[in-house]
Amino acid sequence: MNLDEVITGVVLAGGKARRMGGADKGLLELDGKPLWRHVADALAPQLATVVISANRHLDIYQASGLKVIPDSIADFPGPLAGMLSVFQQVAGDWFLFCPCDNPCIPHNLVDRLAAHRHGAPVVWVHDGERDHPTIALINRAVEPQLTAYLQAGERRVMIFMRQVGGHAVDFSDCKEAFVNVNTPEELAQWQKRP
């Protein structure tokens, strides 16, 4: 199966961004463009379609021309809620999720995740030191379990991913590609890089 033809890319831009003082992290600029755009631009050559999952400033995201998927669950309940909203509102079987604060994802992210899926409904990035469960290739088949998990009040991404039979894919050879931007200081450091 050639997954790259049927995978929808999703930029997760719905976090509370507490460490950014509540600012909409996806709209913060790095090198003259919003963080979410860096991720969308990196995903676009790898996938036929890219959408944005967001829960505020929808008009700004919609001005990009990309389809914007609002959360179907109120009160910012986390990335799993954004994922469920995408399953509910976008056709297709496979979705590649990536948070808006990972501006340097590798050009072969989709191919590597798909190649190491080995039949699992969920695979995510491991950078050699830590898991990145929100950078994940996920099949719609997990939607019923995800719905039940969220209805039970659960929010922990890693636990859910393991419960549905997922596993990590090793990206230790490009660990630096998964450094994210969480604080104003980190954003300033990114701005200073060569």
From Swiss-Prot:
Q: Which reaction does it catalyse?
A: Mo-molybdopterin + GTP + H(+) = Mo-molybdopterin guanine dinucleotide + diphosphate
Q: Which CDD domains match?
A: MobA
What are the GO cellular component annotations? cytoplasm
Q: Name one GO biological process term.
A: bis(molybdopterin guanine dinucleotide)molybdenum biosynthetic process
- Which Pfam families does the record match to this protein? NTP_transf_3 (PF12804)
Instruction: List residues binding Mg(2+).
Output: 101
Cofactor(s) demanded: Mg(2+)
| Chain sites annotated for binding GTP | 12-14, 25, 71, 101
Sample GO molecular function, one term: GTP binding
Give the keywords, sorted.
Answer: Cytoplasm, GTP-binding, Magnesium, Metal-binding, Molybdenum cofactor biosynthesis, Nucleotide-binding, Transferase
Q: Kindly give the InterPro entries that the UniProt entry links to this protein.
A: MobA-like_NTP_Trfase (IPR025877), Molybde_CF_guanTrfase (IPR013482), Nucleotide-diphossugar_trans (IPR029044)
Give the range the annotation lists for the signal sequence: none
Q: Tell where it localizes.
A: Cytoplasm
The EC number of this protein is 2.7.7.77
Quaternary state and partners of this protein?
Answer: Monomer.
Q: What is known of its domains?
A: The N-terminal domain determines nucleotide recognition and specific binding, while the C-terminal domain determines the specific binding to the target protein.
**UniProt record similarity statement:** Belongs to the MobA family.
| Known function | Transfers a GMP moiety from GTP to Mo-molybdopterin (Mo-MPT) cofactor (Moco or molybdenum cofactor) to form Mo-molybdopterin guanine dinucleotide (Mo-MGD) cofactor.
NCBIfam families hit by this protein: molyb_mobA
Q: Which protein, by its recorded name, is this? A: Molybdenum cofactor guanylyltransferase
Per the record, the gene is: mobA
